Amino acid sequence: MKKAILSVSNKTGIVEFAKALTQLNYELYSTGGTKRILDEANVPVRSVSDLTHFPEIMDGRVKTLHPAVHGGILADRNKPQHLNELSEQHIDLIDMVVVNLYPFQQTVANPDVTMDEAIENIDIGGPTMLRAAAKNYKHVTTIVHPADYQEVLTRLRNDSLDESYRQSLMIKVFEHTAEYDEAIVRFFKGDKETLRYGENPQQSAYFVRTSNAKHTIAGAKQLHGKQLSYNNIKDADATLALVKKFDTPAAVAVKHMNPCGVGIGDTLEQAFHHAYEADSQSIFGGIVALNRAVTPELAEQLHSIFLEVIIAPKFTDEALNILKQKKNVRLLEIDMTIDSNEEEFVSVSGGYLVQDKDNYVVPKEEMKVVTEVAPTDEQWEAMLLGWKVVPSVKSNAIILSNNKQTVGIGAGQMNRVGAAKIALERAIEINDHVALVSDGFFPMGDTVELAAQHGIKAIIQPGGSIKDQDSIDMANKHGIAMVVTGTRHFKH
């Protein structure tokens, strides 16, 4: 029977993953809080102490730092000497290590964090196990991101968990531990950047970098322009998160943390034209992110508009020369890699909230058409584009989109019909190919009725209201195609 060690700080999906491993004939070992959760879920799991024959000591500071653990992980199974030594010491082979680390970055992001709290959240045993397993990737599977659980299970079931895939997991581990160590260094060096002021001039502010990863705002390479302001940093982060959702050439414009225009196209120039056309007024003074290299042709378009920040994975030399003619525009070069394990946190009085980022995308095949009329292909494309955008809009949020751009956005309203009114009134076009997208369900049929009055013929929304049928009946009355996704996307 194969053996796996599970010791995770981020408990997302761990119970389901552990259950699946037991069904695949893995014997599970765990520590502390992870073991408690698995015990409560009735998942067969043993304590790591059963491997080490040594108890956890010093409030859990020492639990996996033991030859019985690391010998089982590091043994080269192609070397008889290693296997003989394991046998002599009664050490079992470990086939899988599933570990993510104490939340150091989240802990030190709290401005009131104490030195003792920071120190207690420096993980020692976790990185040691991860690095040992990653070093021995030819024989051991190591998982640091919950997002990889499903792929690992699929490969275990179809016998395709090969060395090449284990090597890809190994790379993720060393990237993760490098970022983790860098965050520790930055914190204790006091690596913070004083900003001119905060959200408003009367507020002082500084920027603490807990990572220097190239796919983050903190790790961005600034090629030109003034120091980023507090508001620039927040808006740039929101813009970057949204543009990363698109595989096709895409452009995103953001003002005050809300997208004002999103466009896609066969080329980046087309995508930006669509984003600009979506709201040519609000883009003034905004942040623009692009997911392809900026060419001279696109740079000319960008140069003609007042923008605070332009983000892209690359700028050609000629494009830079054009854009640098404006001395104040900030140009940021950022890797467009998506970090599937990102978390976000918000400070509140006396503490802070931590949650996974809302990156889940419902597959089209899991969405349900609930009306008598089904969407056309073009309406489906419009819905799916809008559904990528709506999680980035403050709730209550209503988006109107076609298959190439947003055409109207109603953000941050206290009631849904109010958000719909704004989106419909500001729409640059409404026709049979435009879809209305809602981040939450309709509590009654009034939003659908309003959409019908403006000529909307396709709606996508989460569903889940006790009065869903009222909205469905209203859609049927007006010949509107409605799709429900089963997943909402509130943003506060």
From Swiss-Prot:
Its EC number is 2.1.2.3, 3.5.4.10. Pathway: Purine metabolism; IMP biosynthesis via de novo pathway; 5-formamido-1-(5-phospho-D-ribosyl)imidazole-4-carboxamide from 5-amino-1-(5-phospho-D-ribosyl)imidazole-4-carboxamide (10-formyl THF route): step 1/1; Purine metabolism; IMP biosynthesis via de novo pathway; IMP from 5-formamido-1-(5-phospho-D-ribosyl)imidazole-4-carboxamide: step 1/1. GO terms for cellular component: cytosol. It comes from the Bacteria. One of its GO terms (molecular function) is IMP cyclohydrolase activity. One of its GO terms (biological process) is 'de novo' IMP biosynthetic process. Keywords: Hydrolase, Multifunctional enzyme, Purine biosynthesis, Transferase. It catalyses: (6R)-10-formyltetrahydrofolate + 5-amino-1-(5-phospho-beta-D-ribosyl)imidazole-4-carboxamide = 5-formamido-1-(5-phospho-D-ribosyl)imidazole-4-carboxamide + (6S)-5,6,7,8-tetrahydrofolate; IMP + H2O = 5-formamido-1-(5-phospho-D-ribosyl)imidazole-4-carboxamide. The keyword Transferase applies. Transmembrane segments: none annotated. PANTHER family: BIFUNCTIONAL PURINE BIOSYNTHESIS PROTEIN ATIC, BIFUNCTIONAL PURINE BIOSYNTHESIS PROTEIN PURH. HAMAP family: PurH. NCBIfam families: PRK00881.1 (NF002049), purH (TIGR00355). This is Bifunctional purine biosynthesis protein PurH.
